[in-house]
Every structure is written in structure tokens, then in C-alpha cells.
């Protein structure tokens, strides 16, 4: 990480910094990110961004993320995180946000341009995530318009789909799951620590062409299984009866902590569903998905409140998965878009 440097932008009172990463700074960033998410109803920063920042704090990494801030005294007015490319073949990822009180003044645009300049000639290797437009019929939010204004064009669309839960839906999901049986050679079980390496192998194979999921490392896995939301009883694995290390398929659920109460919260998430390429074509994905849905239908948050909804994310071009989730009652709630410099979708 670069040493702290400061310059005062000519048109604002904000100070731009790229501070050395510390635990105190990460706490400040988390507070900023939570406040933005509370205001906007969607997080501007992905789970992977938070994980990469934590990893960089805990251990020395060859390609640490870069965190740029626009500060007003002790207040973070805007933040820009660049996840550095790990190889010549990979691209980097940018996520950024402006605090609500500082929007509409041009401060975000000036800061974004400054941060991109700090990336130098490598800036063209980065793609920008913009989270949470209302639907997929156009660019509806200032953030999406902002991306376009700065020469970025959409190259990937990710749907957040939601299934509200009521008693009828809960019963239906449980009945559907009970009606599905695994092949005779497989058994359903839940995750244990002994599954780390077998799971990583199957995950990499199942998501060989996925830009994020297929690249999960042991450190990434342990970061997630060590988090406060992880529940092994919600991580389902279909494996050979005679060989637990032979994983045919899996589905992982997530119930985030500290969600509060609302019409659709607390919510649980179908975090990831994967099928070993050697086992594809037999309906295992649907069977494991239904098992996870039945689990979430009867689950509660950390305070004992039953879940009000189930969420999941799916790429817009994954028509098979989209059709499956639509058939199960899910509908698109918001849309995330990834942008690249000078490209069109």
C-alpha cells in the first residue's frame, strides 16, 4: 500500500488521500459503507471488496487493493476501492460511493477522476461495478449515469431476485424439496472443515468461466466460513455415499447478521449453487436449490425472527438459472451492472 499522500482539490474543500490500511481506517470505511447502504437501500461495495481489504490488513499480499478517500475533516465524503489485477490476464474491479450529504456538488465526479488518474496506465484494465438500479429497462440511477458520463459502458448485468415468504410459500418450498430425491449413489449432508479442498476443486470446475466465483481461494473460503453469518447447517453437499470427498453438487446459504426488521427483512440468501461438471444434466442443481430454499423457509435470523424473504443473484445471460428461479417464484428486484472503459454490452 502506498504511504499516505494528500492534495487539496482546487474546486472543493475535500482532501484526497490514499491512506495506509489500518484497523481503525477499515472501521471508518465500514461505517461509511453502512451509512451509504442504509440511505440507498443497496450496498455500494461487494462482499469480496470487504474481504480483500481485510486480507490486506491481516497479511502481506502481492496485489493489495487500493483505497482512496475524499475527506472533509474527519468525515469520509467519498470512497473508491480498486481491487488490483492479480495477473496479466485478469482485470481489476472498481467500486465507489459518495456520502449522501456530499452528492450533487460535483465532488464525486472530481474525486472519481482523481482516483482513476492514480491508477495510471493500468486504469484501462479495470471494470466498474454499479449496484442497485430499479430494473433492467435502462439506466435509472445517478450512479449509472455517472459511469456513462465517465466513458464506461455496461458489459455485464447481474440480477438480484427476491422471493417473499409467507406461510403458504414456506409450506410449498418444503413440499417441493421433500418431493425431490437424490440418485441412489449420493447422500445429502452438510459442510465440515474436511470439505475445504474437495469443495475448492469442485467449485473451481463448476465455475471455471465465472469471473469471481471460480477464483475463490482457500483464504477466501476461510474468510467466509469464519464470518459471523456462516452456518454449516445451511451449507448442503451431495456427495458419494462411499466417498465424502467426491462432491457431486452443493448449495450454500447465507443469513446476514444485523439486518433489522422490514417488509422483506430479515432475508436469507441462496449464496451459491454449484454442480460438478461430471454430474451435470441430472437435475442436481434444482434438487440442491430446493433443499436450500426449504432450509431458509424455516430458518430465522440471529435473534430468532423468521425470515421474510429469500434473495439470490444471477447473471442476466444465465438463462437456465434465471428460468429456474422464475419458476420457483422469484422476481427481479434490482440490477447491478459492470462497466468497462470504451465497451458496449
Regions found by a protein language model. Name each.
Residues 95, 99, 103, 131, ...:
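Residue-level recognition of the GNAT/N-acetyltransferase active site
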Residues 1-10, 87-88, 100-184, 339-341:
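Acyl-donor-binding surface of acyltransferase catalytic domains
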Residues 18-19, 30-136, 248-267:
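Conserved donor-binding loop and adjoining core beta-sheet/short helix segment
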Residues 199, 245-251, 259-267, 279-283, ...:
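Extended hydrophobic-aromatic, low-complexity segments
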Residues 145-170, 290-294, 303-345:
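Active-site/acyl-donor-binding loops of N-acyltransferases
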Residues 104-118, 272-275, 281-298, 322-327:
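Conserved acetyl-CoA-binding loop-helix of GNAT-fold acetyltransferases
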Residues 2-56, 175-214:
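Short amphipathic alpha-helix that is part of the acyltransferase structural core
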Residues 204-256:
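Phosphate-binding active sites in nucleotide-utilizing proteins
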Amino acid at each position: 500500500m502506498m504511504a499516505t499522500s494528500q492534495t487539496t482539490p482546487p474546486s472543493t474543500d475535500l482532501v484526497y488521500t490514499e491512506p495506509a490500511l489500518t484497523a481503525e481506517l477499515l472501521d471508518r470505511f465500514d461505517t461509511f459503507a453502512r451509512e451509504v447502504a442504509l440511505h440507498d437501500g443497496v450496498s455500494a461495495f461487494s462482499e469480496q471488496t470487504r474481504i480483500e481489504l481485510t486480507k490486506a490488513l491481516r497479511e502481506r499480499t502481492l496485489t493489495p487493493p487500493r483505497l482512496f478517500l475524499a475527506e472533509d475533516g474527519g468525515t469520509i465524503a467519498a470512497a473508491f476501492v480498486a481491487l488490483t489485477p492479480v495477473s496479466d490476464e485478469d482485470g481489476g474491479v472498481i467500486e465507489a460511493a459518495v456520502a449522501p450529504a456530499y452528492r450533487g456538488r460535483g465532488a464525486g465526479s472530481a474525486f472519481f477522476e482523481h482516483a482513476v488518474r492514480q491508477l495510471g496506465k493500468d486504469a484501462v484494465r479495470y471494470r466498474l461495478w454499479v449496484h442497485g438500479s430499479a430494473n433492467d429497462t435502462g439506466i435509472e440511477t445517478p450512479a449509472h449515469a455517472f459511469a456513462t458520463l465517465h466513458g464506461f459502458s455496461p458489459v455485464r448485468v447481474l440480477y438480484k431476485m427476491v422471493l417473499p415468504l409467507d406461510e403458504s410459500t414456506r409450506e410449498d418450498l418444503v413440499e417441493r424439496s421433500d418431493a425431490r430425491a437424490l440418485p441412489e449413489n449420493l447422500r445429502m449432508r452438510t459442510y465440515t472443515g474436511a470439505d475445504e479442498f474437495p469443495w475448492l476443486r469442485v467449485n473451481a470446475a463448476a465455475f471455471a468461466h465465472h469471473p469471481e466465483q471460480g477464483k475463490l481461494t482457500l483464504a477466501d473460503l476461510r474468510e467466509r466460513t469464519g464470518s459471523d453469518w456462516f452456518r454449516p447447517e445451511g451449507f448442503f453437499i451431495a456427495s458419494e455415499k462411499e466417498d465424502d470427498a467426491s462432491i457431486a453438487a452443493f448449495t450454500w446459504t447465507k443469513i446476514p447478521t444485523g439486518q433489522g426488521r422490514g417488509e422483506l427483512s430479515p432475508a436469507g440468501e441462496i449464496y451459491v449453487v454449484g454442480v460438478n461438471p461430471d454430474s451435470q444434466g441430472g437435475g442436481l442443481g434444482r434438487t440442491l436449490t430446493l433443499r436450500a430454499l426449504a432450509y431458509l423457509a424455516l430458518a430465522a435470523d440471529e435473534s430468532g425472527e423468521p425470515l421474510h424473504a429469500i434473495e439470490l443473484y444471477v447473471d442476466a445471460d444465465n438463462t437456465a438459472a434465471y428460468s429456474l428461479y422464475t419458476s420457483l417464484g422469484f422476481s427481479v428486484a434490482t440490477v447491478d451492472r459492470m462497466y468497462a472503459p470504451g465497451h458496449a454490452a
